[in-house]
Amino acid sequence: MRLDTMKETPSSPVNTEMQDNFGCAVGNRFHQLLDDESDPLDFLYQSGVELTRRKKKEDAAAKKSANQKSGKKESQKDRKAAVVGGNTDVKMTPQTESGKVSQKDRKTFVVGGNTDVKVTQPGQKHAPKNMEKAPQNENVGSQVKVDRAERRPAFREVRPNIMDRSNEYSIEKPMEILDQDKQMRNYGGRGGMRGRGRGGFPRNTENDNLRGKREFDRHSGSDRAIRPEDKRGGSGPRNWGSIKEAFSEIEAIPVEEQIETTETTEATEEEHAKVPEEKNEGFSQEMSLDEWRSLQDQNRSKTEFNLRKPEAAVPTKAVVIHKSKFKNNLSENEEDYHYCFRKPVNDITAQLDINFGSLTRPSRGRGGGGRGRVRREEAFPHEVINVLADAPNPDDPEDFPALA
């Protein structure tokens, strides 16, 4: 839009120049929304319709691609040919566009009835021979189960191929062991009281052992190598004797003796428990702390040390150090203690008298010539200062109070 600040006067040329020179252009940012009367909900509805159209197009394209693929490879449902009912002759020639036949295409699933199935593969010229016809019977599966059950040998059945087992080692179980076996067998097999599977409910509660298998005799080697008669005399292989003799040697301990022993042990324990209580009651006394400590010292076990007594004889390697000799050595070495640094053998500094105060200092004067009053240096006497003190005497209690 273009707005003019001046009023229009058609006859004046000045106004036209003013319009061209002093006009300003103003743009309205919201002029596009002035003519918009549509509802925003309509826009949302249209966008939803467009989305549905796109989805339909995508689904149609996916179906077309699937049909194209199915022309090359058949689906799994098409590969299965299920034939149900009476006598039928089925001939299958699985061939695809590519000319290859998959292994799944060669399978035929036939359910019930007599069927003659002929499968011709592309590599074979003639079809294979007809398969043998199965007998007509509706309960085919049940008949097979019955045959398998009949083939199973009975539990603990003596088989003709195996020699008769000798009962020489069999021992009758006592009643207590049989009761325990029955209680343990009630828990079932590995799975417990499940009702099915390996566990399940117990089959027989009698004449069975804990392991659930046949009871093996106690011997080593195979059944063929066992001799029926017992060996005696202590010679030859497998001379173990009979197990009955081993059990007869073990004598059962009577129950009365066990009861008597338990009663005696209980009585002795009660007596031992009463005796310390009586002693403690009579020993209660009042005493001071010092008396109690003295009693503790008396009751305490004293440790005995194996001390060596001094001998009168002097050992041969003993050396006596005289005190006078030690003092003389100290007096001789007193001069050496004044020097704390090591000195070489050819050192002459101890013989020279060096005075550092005799050195001349630079004069103070005007100009660079060093003119001025000459200052007279005074000679200072050289004083010898003893830095190190005398070494302490170990025999003097004042120097070593802890060693006195």
Curated annotation (Swiss-Prot):
Biased composition (Basic and acidic residues): 71-81, 145-159, 165-184, 205-233, 270-281
DNA-binding listed as a keyword: no
Top-level taxon in the UniProt lineage: Eukaryota
GO annotations of cellular component type: Cajal body; cytoplasm; cytoplasmic stress granule; nuclear speck; nucleolus; nucleus
Keywords: Cytoplasm, Nucleus, Translation regulation
Composition bias, Gly residues: 188-200
One Gene Ontology term from the biological process aspect of the record: ribosome hibernation
Compositionally biased tracts (Polar residues): 8-19
Protein location: Nucleus; Cytoplasm; Cytoplasm, Stress granule; Nucleus, Nucleolus
UniProt-listed SMART domains: HABP4_PAI-RBP1
Region (Disordered): 1-21, 51-288, 359-379
Coiled-coil residues: none
A GO molecular-function annotation: RNA binding
Predominant place of localization: nucleus
Subunit structure comment from the entry: Associates with ribosomes; promoting ribosome stabilization. Interacts with eef2/eEF2; promoting ribosome stabilization.
Family recorded in the similarity comment: Belongs to the SERBP1-HABP4 family.
Function according to Swiss-Prot or TrEMBL: Ribosome-binding protein that promotes ribosome hibernation, a process during which ribosomes are stabilized in an inactive state and preserved from proteasomal degradation. Acts via its association with eef2/eEF2 factor at the A-site of the ribosome, promoting ribosome stabilization in an inactive state compatible with storage. Plays a key role in ribosome hibernation in the mature egg by promoting ribosome stabilization. Ribosomes, which are produced in large quantities during oogenesis, are stored and translationally repressed in the egg and early embryo.
Name recorded for this polypeptide: Intracellular hyaluronan-binding protein 4.L
Lineage: Eukaryota, Metazoa, Chordata, Craniata, Vertebrata
Designated gene of the protein: habp4.L
